[in-house]
């Protein structure tokens, strides 16, 4: 009998912690909303909307056996172990700096109490500590990281099957909250606008991957650069919340080449984008101040402007620049923005308005359903020119907006 602590792994398939916990006989699956340790990195409002609906879907898959709680995970897990006489806990690792510190402390303290903790990699293809240069230092440039550190390393783990049967321990002495008591949904109607643009949950994630591979990966290499085209996977929120594993996505695309489907350039490009996701998490692991400090220290004295009117106009999609405003309005309405548009609106903020990249990072954190601490902070530093493998600070993002400005999000039809 064991506890399976759910974090950013809201799925049954290819879930190492769940699979191993299930072998102990029976499990108690618990999700804990950590409001103690996350501090300034607590999930943003759009992310909370997604999390609410995704937890609801996962609970259905668990036959409504999922336990919900809110507070300090160490206290809650300790209480649950005591009340149900459990001495084993399983979880999949997460890699935000505050999570790493918390989990290390919990693991050490549980060991002192005679409780065994088992942790697994369920969210990355390669562990950060396994990808280092010959001199033992971390990479700061993507291409050698990806080609030498990843593609020439041990192949990622193949996806695991979903457990055929899960036995649930009947919890008698611990009171679960309801999903609604987690208070994830904002009071205003914005949440309905956000969620109406998406199908949420593990089954939706698998369907999205299958649809992408079937109809949209052909032409991905070039099409991904044009917001008006559909050559993007839109898998980022599903990956962030662990509704699908990166291993499942990786091998679904990798195996297209093995089976003779002739989209080699498109599949290679998509896999390299998966590599960028890995690289972002890798950078955050080795440079934990990435969300708030310039990776390149020479930018520390840059003379940023501090203009709240400019910032508000950018946030509201009222800059007067059609492609920027279309992107920002799409973000507010759907919780998502095409990656090319993220580069354009980000470049406009830091290089045209001269506002600090942290302002953009904070706004995206609150508005994106796929807001990921690693990707968000490394992406903004890349745009500003102060990060790893960054675009030159004087290079301004450009794009033809002719088609985009006719989109439903543009205020200038």
Which residue ranges define each predicted feature?
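Trp/Phe/Arg-rich N-terminal binding region typifying the photolyase-homology
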Residues: 1-157, 329, 375
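Hydrophobic alpha-helical scaffolding
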Residues: 41-44, 48, 132, 195-199, ...
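Soluble or luminal CAZymes and related metallo-dependent hydrolases
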Residues: 50, 54, 201, 319, ...
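Alpha-helical packing segments of well-folded alpha/beta enzyme cores
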Residues: 17, 54, 58, 205-208, ...
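Glycine/tryptophan-enriched, flexible segments
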Residues: 115, 137-294, 400-402
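Positively charged, low-complexity/disordered segments
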Residues: 403-413
């Amino acid at each position: 009998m064991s506890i399976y602590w759910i974090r950013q792994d809201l799925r049954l398939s290819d879930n190492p912690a769940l699979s191993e916990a299930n072998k102990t006989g029976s499990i108690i699956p618990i999700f804990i909303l950590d409001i103690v340790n996350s501090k300034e990195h607590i999930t943003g409002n759009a992310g909370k909307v997604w999390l609410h609906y995704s937890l609801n879907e996962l609970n259905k898959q668990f036959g409504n056996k999922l336990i919900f709680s809110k507070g300090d995970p160490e206290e809650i897990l300790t209480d649950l172990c005591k009340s149900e006489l459990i001495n084993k806990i399983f979880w999949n690792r997460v890699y935000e700096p505050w999570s790493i510190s918390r989990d290390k402390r919990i693991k050490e303290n549980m060991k002192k109490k005679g409780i065994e903790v088992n942790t697994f990699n369920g969210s990355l293809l390669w562990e950060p500590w396994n990808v280092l240069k010959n001199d033992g230092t971390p990479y700061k440039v993507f291409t050698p990281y990806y080609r030498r550190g990843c593609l020439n390393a041990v192949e990622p783990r193949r996806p695991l099957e979903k457990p055929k049967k899960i036995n649930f321990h009947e919890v008698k002495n611990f009171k679960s909250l309801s999903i609604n008591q987690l208070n994830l949904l904002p009071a205003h109607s914005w949440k309905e606008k956000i969620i109406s643009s998406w199908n949420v949950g593990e089954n939706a994630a698998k369907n999205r991957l299958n649809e992408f591979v079937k109809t949209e990966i052909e032409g991905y290499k070039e099409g991904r650069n044009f917001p008006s085209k559909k050559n993007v996977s839109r898998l980022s929120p599903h990956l962030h919340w662990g509704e699908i594993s990166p291993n499942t996505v990786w091998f679904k695309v990798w195996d297209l080449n093995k089976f003779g489907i002739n989209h080699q350039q498109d599949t290679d490009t998509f896999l390299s984008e998966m590599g960028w996701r890995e690289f972002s998490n890798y950078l955050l692991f080795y440079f934990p101040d990435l969300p708030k400090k310039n990776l390149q220290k020479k930018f520390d004295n840059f003379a940023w402007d501090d203009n709240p009117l400019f910032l508000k106009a950018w946030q509201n999609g009222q800059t007067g620049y059609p492609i920027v405003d279309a992107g920002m309005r799409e973000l507010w309405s759907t919780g998502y923005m095409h990656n090319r548009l993220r580069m354009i609106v980000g470049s406009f903020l830091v290089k045209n308005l001269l506002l600090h990249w942290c302002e953009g990072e904070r706004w995206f954190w609150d508005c994106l359903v796929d807001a990921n601490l690693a990707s968000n902070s490394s992406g903004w530093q890349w745009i500003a020119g102060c990060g790893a493998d960054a675009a030159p600070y004087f290079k301004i993002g450009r794009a033809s907006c002719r088609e985009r400005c006719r989109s439903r999000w543009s205020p200038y039809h």
